[in-house]
């Protein structure tokens, strides 16, 4: 009797499911944006431009090759907004929400994937956390739209309702897409509202709130202002976020925006310190800013928001853990510490890995674009930082880039959104060593 070999069914890991989900939604979005109905001129958008826009929206980046307000129709803008919302919440979270609404039970495998997608510390209570994420997102986005409504309705009439909702979702999801461009003035972002205290403050607040992370908001909701009861991660996020908001604001106020009234300078300084982490709106001419300010914005872009949030970048916790580990090394301590707690050694190793991966992609992408487009390296570094950290700020070169350079940015945006560890674990899986090799010291520094 002939026995045929049995082929073991391949099981996708949670990390591979997350990546496949983002890729599938991005491709569907690109196909929808290619339809003639998606543009105001009823023309077919080239695939690479549609894919670039779809990836930018899904990865909540904001880099565009066509002006969103003047090129895309109401249908196209709706597709972009849907992609932004899916990307902000996460493909897995949105899928879980539909499953919950339909009354289906969430399997153990699905709960594990949801845990990885939301950066939750444990699998228990993950369904409840998903419900909280949906509620808090709806609350902030609707409240933001209501606050933006008077300004946009005053300028655009009934269209202002759509503008308020679009920009509120775009801000909370840290996407940076705007509808304010026209045929005569494209890619203007929020520059016309630079002196509007209400609009700039609301947009900035939505960006910060979206970038804090849903676990942080769960702590705030549960314990209110009792900071000592927050989990260590939430404490680190809040302190690091405050640090990364206040110091750049002071720098911009003192050295960059030195003209105009005190109110104008404060608004400009505050907004330009918020938006690099990682929203993509701007109220100032970024290309006209000094080289030192542009370099500071590159650093802020790479650091990004917080884990389990709508923001991208290396994440505030990565930055904080590296600083804590450096401080521990200076003091010749074995462990890095925060708020009376030791940081797990694997967290330090992961932080170093993520930082190394982001910096490698950042420099490699800039090198390829600078070579292909014959552009200054400083401009390309700004562009690749914006892409890999899913920010969306640009010095104006994005629409002029060739297909190769657009492909590089698409890859950087995708890799930046799915996350460093997700990509690593999906690519290499887990293969624990059965034995340990002999150890030998190596000189460092």
Features from the language model and the residues they span:
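Membrane-proximal intracellular helices of multi-pass ion channels
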Residues: 1-445
């Amino acid at each position: 009797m002939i026995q045929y070999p049995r082929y073991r069914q391949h099981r996708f890991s949670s990390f591979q499911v997350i990546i496949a989900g983002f890729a599938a939604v991005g491709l569907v979005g690109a196909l929808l944006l290619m339809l003639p109905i998606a543009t105001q001129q009823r023309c077919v958008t080239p695939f690479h431009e549609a894919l670039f826009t779809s990836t930018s929206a899904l990865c909540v980046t904001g880099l565009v090759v066509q002006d969103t307000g003047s090129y895309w129709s109401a249908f196209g803008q709706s597709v972009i907004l849907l992609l932004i919302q899916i990307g902000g919440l996460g493909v897995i979270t949105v899928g879980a929400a539909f499953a919950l609404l339909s009354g289906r039970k969430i399997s153990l495998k699905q709960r594990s994937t949801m845990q990885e997608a939301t950066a939750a510390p444990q699998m228990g209570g993950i369904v409840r956390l998903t419900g909280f994420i949906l509620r808090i997102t709806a609350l902030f986005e609707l409240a933001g739209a209501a606050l933006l409504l008077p300004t946009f309705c005053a300028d655009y009439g009934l269209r202002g309702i759509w503008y308020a909702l679009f920009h509120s979702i775009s801000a909370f999801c840290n996407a940076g897409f705007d509808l304010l461009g026209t045929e005569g003035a494209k890619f203007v972002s929020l520059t016309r509202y630079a002196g509007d205290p209400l609009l700039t403050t609301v947009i900035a607040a939505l960006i910060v709130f979206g970038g804090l992370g849903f676990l942080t908001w769960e702590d705030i909701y549960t314990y209110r202002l009792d900071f000592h009861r927050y989990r260590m991660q939430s404490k680190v996020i809040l302190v690091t976020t405050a640090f990364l908001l206040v110091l750049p604001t002071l720098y911009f106020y003192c050295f960059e925006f030195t003209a105009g009234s005190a109110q104008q300078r404060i608004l400009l300084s505050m907004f330009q310190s918020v938006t690099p982490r990682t929203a993509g709106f701007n109220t100032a001419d970024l290309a006209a800013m000094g080289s030192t300010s542009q370099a500071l914005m590159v650093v802020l872009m790479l650091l990004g928001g917080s884990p389990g949030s709508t923001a991208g970048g290396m994440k505030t916790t990565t930055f904080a853990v590296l600083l804590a580990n450096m401080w521990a090394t200076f003091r010749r301590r074995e462990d890095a510490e925060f708020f009376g707690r030791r940081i797990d050694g694997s967290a330090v190793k992961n932080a170093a890995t993520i930082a190394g991966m982001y910096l490698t992609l950042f420099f490699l992408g800039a090198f390829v674009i600078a070579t292909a487009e014959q552009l200054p390296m400083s401009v390309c570094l700004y562009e690749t930082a914006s892409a890999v950290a899913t920010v969306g700020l640009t010095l104006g070169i994005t629409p002029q880039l060739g297909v190769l350079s657009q492909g590089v940015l698409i890859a950087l945006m995708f890799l930046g959104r799915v996350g460093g560890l997700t990509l690593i674990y999906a690519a290499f899986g887990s293969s624990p060593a059965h034995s340990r090799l002999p150890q030998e010291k190596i000189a460092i520094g």
